[in-house]
Amino acid sequence: MKRSFLVLALLLSPSLPAQAPVAVPIAKEPHHHLVLENDYVRVFRVSVPAHDATLLHQHDVPYLYISLGPADVINAVQGKPEARIVMADGQLGYSLGHFAHIARNESDVPFNNVTIELLKPQGEVQNICVEVVPGVEKQTCSRSVMEKRSGMSNVPQFQTDEISASMARLDPDAEQITMTQYTGTLFVLLGGSGIQTMVKGKPDQTLVVGDVMWLLAGSNATFYNPAHKAWSYLTVGFKGSEALHKY
């Protein structure tokens, strides 16, 4: 009798509202691997195998993302219709963050990128020579803005009140370059093979695509290209980071 009453009560009771899924912090999402963190950035190397997907995860701050290889993914933002995102190898994107989503890779190849969380408020966004942020007018991209010299081109991508991002492409015969940064700068290798680095106070390294480095303001960094293949990199300079010496 009691069992019959319980079944009847369950049938007659109003249905409970469905619980919304809870997003995990980005650092807890298993496809996101933290590779660098300081007062300005948290940098994640992201890899999603073919026909796999991330967990629902939260983006709480603005961030940059740059594709390593071509990308074709479904961006499922919580509470919004799904959208397809197609990116070329080395294409840079920017997001204001403050949402949760799932990145679903329905293609037959892995999806790889570098996600760069920006830990300071960014303020106004300006495209310079590339439309990184759709709908934002590009600034004048003149020869004086674009740095071109023998074997190398350096093209400003976009900037905010806090950062400036540029993309450099180097010819195979660009065997060695030395860079002096005037602000703390994030370096991301986008293309190349066996690029070697020499930075004062740090052990020499051999970089592979997707590797990142933090270059201190005022430091000299020398890069060698022993394979004599074309290579490319992204730099993100952080305004106000001149005194950042502890990383």
Predicted region positions:
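A short, N-terminal "cap"/entry segment at the start of jelly-roll beta-barrel domains
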Residues: 19-45, 50-53, 75-77, 81-169, ...
